[in-house]
Every structure is written in structure tokens, then in C-alpha cells.
A protein has these predicted regions:
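Classical eukaryotic N-terminal signal peptides for Sec-dependent ER targeting/secretion
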Residues: 1-12
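Long, position-biased, composition-driven segments near the start of the mature protein
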Residues: 13-358
Length: 358
């Protein structure tokens, strides 16, 4: 996807919100709208982009594979959906923005923040004390809220669900942080350690939120009270429902549509033409079953196509110190979902078995 696309999608709505804000405080100093926008906008855009790239990875072999339409996060767009998939998009995008802001803060990209040393010197546990340079997640969380949550201008149930899932994403960044330590002592005895907290790899956050997606909770609400909009009756119904929701639990309102079939109005492309996996090294069971999930169970057949690819081969090490490779062409068998023929299949098309039941 072009960088300009996600820049517009992830920031355009926020820019307007910030321009209308009188001012907001960051680390005890005041920044007015346009200046604040320019300071953090590139990090927000990069964070939103990394979130969507992770979404595409996590759902690469699912019927819904995080298409470009999933980037439309704000509730004033024409989709207004609150499905299980939408909950993940909000969470992973929010996490991506917070993650990037936190990382860039630790790298010294912003004058307004640095390491989190608030606990330095305190005893953390047996044989170790807090010290070093912990990643400043509080800063990342605060600025992420100001940007990402500003996209949510509604006050109905869907808006509250989106804000909740935004928060789930931010909490995921905190929940996956790692403790890193450095040993101190005579002759490397490591009699005491100095430790700090650092961000996990973003893939770990994606894996964490994918589990939350699988365990997401559907909210059952009275549709008549929901249609009341921002009335006292609607707010009461929403508050009552959210009272039983855990802060780290993804929630959704509507059942997912049939992602097997194309629906242009909803931005769903269907699974026809999608690649699937049948063989290969280090494939998970989920990946090995992708042909059944994407093709067979969607009423499509698996079609094998042979594609020519160019790859490095016959690599040799030369003293000193380079590796030289040849460029080899080879035919690789790939598998795609295709429509079933109404007549007998031509001889050149190989039908594949449907795979094992899950």
C-alpha cells in the first residue's frame, strides 16, 4: 500500500480534531494544535502502518485477510461495522501507534520525553534493583490516546466499543513488555542485577492480540435501546453491558459476514483467486489447512499453477569476505482457489483432495 494512503486514513481525521483543540499538555509543557500534529504525526502514521502490516500477517491465511478497507477506522465512515475483525483492527492499530511513539521516545526522537527512570534505585525483587533506561510506555500511551481516540467522534454503542478495543491494544503493549537485566559483582559474580523494562518485538503483541481475537466476547444488547443513540436509556444499557467486560477483552457487536463471497459494498473481496498452502517447510497446521479453509469450505476448488521464479543459488564464500551467488530459474507449484467447473474438468487441471477435517 502506498504510504500516502495510510497517512490520509490514519491522520486526516486526527488533524482536524487537534486543530480544534485549544491546547494539550505533554510532560509539563503546552503545545498548540498544529505544532503538536507535526511533532508526532510521522510516528503516528508509521505506527498505524505497522499495525496494519501485522494485521495482514496474522490473517494472511484466513478468509478475511485484513484488506485495505479495514483501515477505515473512524465510526463516521460509511461502514460503521462492529465485528470481531473490526475489534482486532482497532486494537492492533492503537497498539502500533503506542509502540512506535514509545520506541521513538526512547531513541531520543522527541525533545519532550526520554527514558522512564521513575523507579530507578528501588528494589524490584530478590537480587535485583530497578535501573537503566526503561521504555517510556506511559508517554506512548498518553499521546496515542490523544491521536487515535480522537478519531472516535460518536457517542453511541459502536463508538464506545471502538474506544474499548483501542484501549485493549494499548494494554497489550504493556502486558508484553520484557524485563532486561545487567549483572554487577566482583569478577562477574552477578551478585546483584540492575533491571529495566523494554518493549517486546511487535510480533509478540500481534500474537497476543490474535489470541484475544479468538476469545473475543460478543455484546448482547437490546437493539431498541441501542437505537436510542445518546439518550439516557442508551447510555444506561451500554454502561450495564460494559460493567461485565474485562479491560483486556476484545468485544464486538455484530456477527461477521460471509467472507467466502465477494461483497464490494463492504470491501470484501472473497476467497476466489486467493493463494493457499498445501506443502512447504515449517508450515503450521493452520497454514497446511488453508486450502480447505479458503477454497473447499467456500465452494471453490484448489487449482495448481506452475510459476517461474528467480532465486539465488549455488552460493559460495570467497576470501575475503564476500558471498557470490548465481541466479537460478525454477518452476514452483502454487495453489489457488478457483471456481468449480460446471462441466467436466479439463485434463490439465488437477483436482486436489479436500484435506482433513479440523
Amino acid at each position: 500500500m502506498k504510504r500516502s494512503t495510510f497517512l490520509i486514513l490514519s491522520i486526516a481525521g486526527v488533524y482536524g480534531a487537534i486543530l480544534h483543540a485549544a491546547a494539550w499538555s505533554v510532560n509539563n509543557f503546552l503545545m498548540t494544535g498544529p505544532k503538536a500534529y507535526l511533532t508526532y504525526s510521522s510516528s503516528v502514521a508509521a505506527g498505524a502502518h505497522s499495525g496494519m502490516e501485522e494485521c495482514k500477517f496474522q490473517f494472511g491465511w484466513e478468509r478475511w485477510n485484513c484488506p485495505e478497507s479495514a483501515l477505515q477506522l473512524s465510526t463516521h465512515n460509511r461502514l460503521r461495522s462492529a465485528t470481531r475483525e473490526t475489534s482486532f483492527v482497532h486494537a492492533i492499530s492503537s497498539a502500533g501507534v503506542m509502540y512506535t511513539l514509545t520506541r521513538n521516545c526512547s531513541m531520543g526522537d522527541f525533545e519532550s520525553c526520554g527514558c522512564d527512570d521513575s523507579r530507578n534505585g528501588r528494589v524490584g525483587g530478590r537480587g535485583w534493583v530497578w535501573g537503566g533506561c526503561s521504555d517510556n510506555v506511559e508517554f506512548g500511551e498518553r499521546i496515542s490516546k490523544l491521536f487515535v481516540d480522537a478519531l472516535e467522534t460518536g457517542h453511541d454503542t459502536r463508538a464506545l466499543i471502538n474506544l474499548h478495543n483501542n484501549e485493549v491494544g494499548r494494554l497489550a503493549v504493556k502486558a508484553t513488555m520484557k524485563r532486561a537485566c545487567k549483572c554487577h559483582g566482583v569478577s562477574g559474580s552477578c551478585s546483584i542485577q540492575t533491571c529495566w523494562l523494554q518493549l517486546a518485538e511487535f510480533r509478540e503483541i500481534g500474537n497476543y492480540l490474535k489470541i484475544k481475537y479468538d476469545q473475543a466476547h460478543k455484546l448482547e444488547m437490546d437493539k431498541r435501546r441501542m437505537r436510542a443513540g445518546n439518550s439516557a436509556d442508551s447510555r444506561g444499557a451500554t454502561a450495564e453491558t460494559f460493567h461485565h467486560v474485562h479491560p483486556t477483552e476484545l468485544v464486538f457487536l455484530e456477527d461477521s459476514p460471509d467472507y467466502c463471497t465477494r461483497n464490494a459494498s463492504l470491501g470484501h473481496h472473497g476467497t476466489e483467486g486467493r493463494e493457499c498452502l498445501q506443502t512447504g517447510k515449517n508450515l503450521s497446521q493452520w497454514e497446511k489447512r488453508s486450502c480447505r479453509r479458503l477454497c473447499t469450505e467456500c465452494g471453490l476448488r484448489v487449482e495448481e499453477r506452475r510459476t517461474e521464479v528467480v532465486a539465488s543459488c549455488n552460493c559460495k564464500f570467497h576470501w575475503c569476505c564476500t558471498v557470490r551467488c548465481e541466479q537460478c530459474r525454477q518452476l514452483v507449484a502454487k495453489h489457488f482457489c478457483a471456481r468449480r467447473d460446471t462441466t467436466a474438468a479439463p485434463n490439465h487441471i488437477k483436482r486436489r483432495n479436500k484435506g482433513h477435517k479440523r
